[in-house]
């Protein structure tokens, strides 16, 4: 049971804001039964309104009007939060039929629409994806059994992975089924049979996902017409457990909305029964998901505040409206109030009041999101364009600062106090790790962060003796990963975007999770320690530390620890795989979850990616040699690189950022100018003439870059003015390429140093041999970009 004590959390004050539009068609007008989805795309924060009905009719069974199916539409309108301007969008492609009472969810810059009801009855059960980057509708087709047509259901993306659907009405009866689609593939619906106390079938409920993946279901109306006030959380893991929230909601309701503002779920409006809207202080209810309490939103009343409060109650009385949130701002649009179809847009800023004193099960009293914006613009693919859902839709999370999903307790931790009431806590000082079978490892955080990074170095920096661990469980706990990330992030934040470095220096190309290759390079050509060569030579790593290989965690944790130990000698810049958009697809997220447990692994992955957003983006050696991960693209200038602000979010920032992370030289010195690149939309290749002009314009002599597999480990371009270096051998287990580093002496002479792929075991034929250092299943499903100079088949 939730604690008895309550605390003040002032209900946010909503106000109607003035909006603008160029034509009557741009303005959505009065609307009900529609959806509102917040998305960051094309460098702007937008609210996307879809569907609904523009008319309402009298309901003979109720004193409240209902949606008129004659007025149902499939129009799309965008509201720019900054300019407050509405714009009608006209996406091309597989346009869904007009519908209302459908469900919408955001996945990257894709808005997913499912179900609803139109003039001829329930809409089809297909998922339609509105690709906001290309203004195009895509009908997502999957094989096997699918959710039946329905309306009045709930849907959202849980844990940035599962598309979850629950309940609704199929036109004949209220359903009680739960469905999930794994956006990582295979792309098929699974009808779930969750354990726990499963909620009853209902329609017109609300469903919202907390950032750590808990799917919250609130209210609704059941098959007998009873209005529900219960709340459930669905935890998407191996067991898929429904957990009821013990605290009693201020009021049962249906046809309401619920959106998160930080860790607090704001439940807005709705109907109490067929004759009455929710009103009074219950019109906006707030569930603190940290404590499991419905919080007290009332403040001491004066005559002035009392009048204002009554105005707020009246303003928020509505049903069949739409709502969305951007960070700490909540938006509500339209709906029905008695006999009025509303067209207003309301906004409120959530209170920053703190929670009560922390409980033992949440000692740091963590909060989530607050002012931060959780938006996911579309990524570039580091591989050739793919047609799968996951490749089209996965995207970079861009925000003012990455929110820490690990700050939220588990749903059991939030909603239960003791083992007697359903929650058995872990041993003090322990945390679940490894596979989902429930291994427990004691956290060793009595040591200082300084001791922690030394522990990492002593454990991992073994150039002569390192072998892949037989046990895949990672040796660091989540809290240790977090502490290490916090410490190294401070260092990166204080470094410039463009590093100014001296020679001698070693330059490393893409490593991609190949820890064995990194140790071989350290063993053959010196390693960064006092016993090695760190006292007389620096190290520069050009990015792409993670993905595709089996040991990305070892690589990034060692490099972070070395950066803490030798901040002036170890230098890291960012690659295109150092982003949520890329490494959620190409293996790093999977590795984190497999080796640290699904929950802690996901949180560690988020935390590491937060550090990636602060990595420098380029380096200058002796003011003569530019080092970047990708290239110069459309011929950027040094000043443009220096002026990129961090934290930086690829694909939502400038074209300069995209160019330095993604662009490549043309295939050979005979291909001049700027040409399209097969990696994806907006990516270019640059010819030798572009390189020469860039060097002359910026007073430089050479460019060093990584980003492409090259057969010999390094390759010259533009008459030797540009060198590509790639450090991982046998890329993805098929390329048979050498790995290399570039050692640059005090005389600025470059010495390539190579390692070659290990031969297959004597007992295996070359044709049958599988290089287990790479994620073979992933690399087969999503083949890598071919080695430079080779064409894809």
Swiss-Prot record:
PROSITE patterns (UniProt xref): SER_THR_PHOSPHATASE
Compartment list: Nucleus
The encoding gene: BSU1
GO process annotations (BP): brassinosteroid mediated signaling pathway; positive regulation of brassinosteroid mediated signaling pathway; regulation of protein localization
MF GO annotations: metal ion binding; protein serine/threonine phosphatase activity
Function: Phosphatase that acts as a positive regulator of brassinosteroid (BR) signaling. Dephosphorylates BES1, a transcription factor that regulates the expression of BR-response genes, thereby playing an important role in the regulation of response to BRs. Inactivates the negative regulator of BR signaling ASK7/BIN2 by dephosphorylation at 'Tyr-200'.
Quaternary structure annotation from Swiss-Prot or TrEMBL: Interacts with CDG1, CDL1 and ASK7/BIN2.
Enzyme class: hydrolase
Catalysed reaction equations from the record: O-phospho-L-seryl-[protein] + H2O = L-seryl-[protein] + phosphate; O-phospho-L-threonyl-[protein] + H2O = L-threonyl-[protein] + phosphate
Free-text remark on how the cofactor is bound: Binds 2 manganese ions per subunit.
Protein name: Serine/threonine-protein phosphatase BSU1
């Amino acid at each position: 049971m939730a604690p008895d004590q309550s605390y003040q959390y002032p209900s946010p004050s909503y106000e109607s804001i003035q909006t603008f539009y160029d034509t009557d068609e741009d303005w959505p007008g009065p609307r009900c039964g529609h959806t509102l989805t917040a998305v960051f795309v094309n460098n702007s924060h937008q609210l996307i309104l879809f569907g609904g009905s523009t008319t309402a009719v009298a309901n003979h069974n109720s004193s409240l009007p209902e949606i008129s199916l004659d007025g149902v539409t499939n129009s799309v309108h965008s509201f720019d939060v900054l300019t407050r301007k509405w714009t009608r969008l006209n996406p091309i492609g597989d346009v869904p039929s007009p519908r209302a009472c459908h469900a919408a969810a955001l996945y990257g810059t894709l808005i997913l629409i499912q179900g609803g009801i139109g003039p001829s009855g329930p809409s089809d059960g297909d998922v339609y994806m509105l690709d906001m980057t290309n203004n195009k509708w895509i009908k997502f087709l999957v094989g096997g059994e699918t959710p039946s047509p329905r309306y009045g259901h709930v849907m959202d993306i849980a844990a940035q992975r599962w598309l979850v659907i629950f309940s609704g009405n199929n036109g004949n009866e209220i359903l009680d089924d739960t469905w999930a689609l794994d956006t990582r593939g295979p792309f098929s619906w699974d009808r779930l049979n969750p354990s726990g106390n499963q909620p009853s079938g209902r329609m017109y409920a609300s469903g919202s996902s907390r950032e750590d993946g808990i799917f919250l279901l609130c209210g609704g109306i059941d098959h007998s017409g009873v209005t529900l006030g219960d709340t459930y959380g669905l935890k998407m893991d191996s067991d898929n457990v429904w957990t009821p929230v013990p605290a009693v909601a201020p009021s049962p309701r249906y046809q309401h909305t619920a959106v998160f503002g930080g860790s607090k779920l704001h439940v807005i409006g709705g109907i109490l029964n067929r004759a009455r809207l929710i009103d009074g202080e219950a019109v906006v209810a707030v569930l603190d998901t940290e404590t499991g309490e419905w919080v007290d939103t009332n403040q001491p009343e004066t005559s002035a505040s009392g009048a204002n409060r009554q105005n707020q109650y009246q303003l928020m009385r509505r049903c069949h409206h739409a709502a969305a949130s951007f960070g700490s701002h909540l938006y509500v649009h339209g709906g029905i109030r008695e006999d009025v179809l509303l067209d207003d847009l309301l906004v409120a800023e959530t209170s920053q009041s703190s929670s009560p004193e922390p409980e033992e099960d949440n000692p740091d009293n963590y909060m989530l999101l607050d002012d931060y914006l959780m938006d996911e613009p579309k990524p570039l693919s580091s591989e050739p364009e793919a047609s799968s859902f996951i490749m089209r839709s996965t995207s970079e999370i861009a925000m003012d600062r990455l929110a820490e999903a690990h700050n939220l307790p588990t749903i059991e931790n939030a909603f239960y106090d003791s083992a007697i009431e359903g929650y058995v806590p872990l041993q003090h000082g322990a945390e679940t790790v490894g596979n989902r079978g429930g291994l427990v490892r004691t956290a060793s955080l009595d040591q200082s962060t300084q001791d922690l990074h030394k522990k990492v170095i002593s454990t991992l920096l073994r150039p002569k003796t390192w072998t892949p661990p037989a046990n895949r469980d990672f040796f660091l706990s989540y809290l240790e990963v977090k502490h290490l990330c916090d410490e190294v992030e401070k260092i990166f934040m204080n470094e410039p975007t463009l590093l100014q470095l001296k020679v001698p220096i070693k330059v490393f190309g893409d490593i991609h999770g190949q820890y064995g290759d990194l140790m071989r390079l350290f063993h053959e050509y010196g390693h960064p320690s006092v016993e090695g060569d760190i006292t007389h030579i620096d190290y520069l790593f050009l990015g792409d530390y993670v993905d595709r290989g089996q040991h990305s965690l070892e690589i990034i944790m060692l490099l972070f620890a070395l950066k803490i130990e030798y901040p002036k000698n170890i230098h890291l810049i960012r690659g295109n795989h150092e982003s949520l958009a890329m490494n959620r697809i190409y293996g790093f997220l999977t590795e984190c979850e497999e080796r640290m447990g699904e929950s802690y692994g996901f949180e560690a992955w988020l935390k590491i990616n937060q550090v990636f957003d602060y990595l420098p983006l380029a380096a200058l050696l002796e003011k003569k040699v530019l080092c970047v991960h990708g290239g110069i693209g459309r011929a950027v200038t040094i000043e443009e690189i220096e002026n990129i602000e961090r934290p930086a979010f690829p694909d939502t920032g400038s074209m300069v950022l995209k160019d330095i992370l993604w662009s490549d030289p043309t295939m050979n010195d005979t291909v001049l100018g700027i040409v399209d690149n097969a990696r994806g939309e907006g990516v270019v290749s640059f010819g030798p003439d572009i390189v020469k002009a860039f060097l002359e314009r910026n007073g430089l002599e050479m460019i060093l870059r990584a980003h492409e597999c090259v057969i010999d480990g390094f390759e010259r371009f533009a008459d030797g003015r540009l060198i590509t270096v790639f450090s991982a051998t046998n890329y993805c287990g098929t390329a048979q390429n050498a790995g290399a580093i570039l050692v640059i002496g005090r005389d600025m002479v470059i010495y390539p140093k190579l390692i070659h792929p290990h031969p297959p075991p004597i007992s295996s034929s070359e044709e049958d041999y599988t290089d287990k250092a790479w994620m073979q299943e992933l690399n087969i499903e999503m083949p890598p970009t071919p080695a430079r100079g080779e064409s894809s088949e």
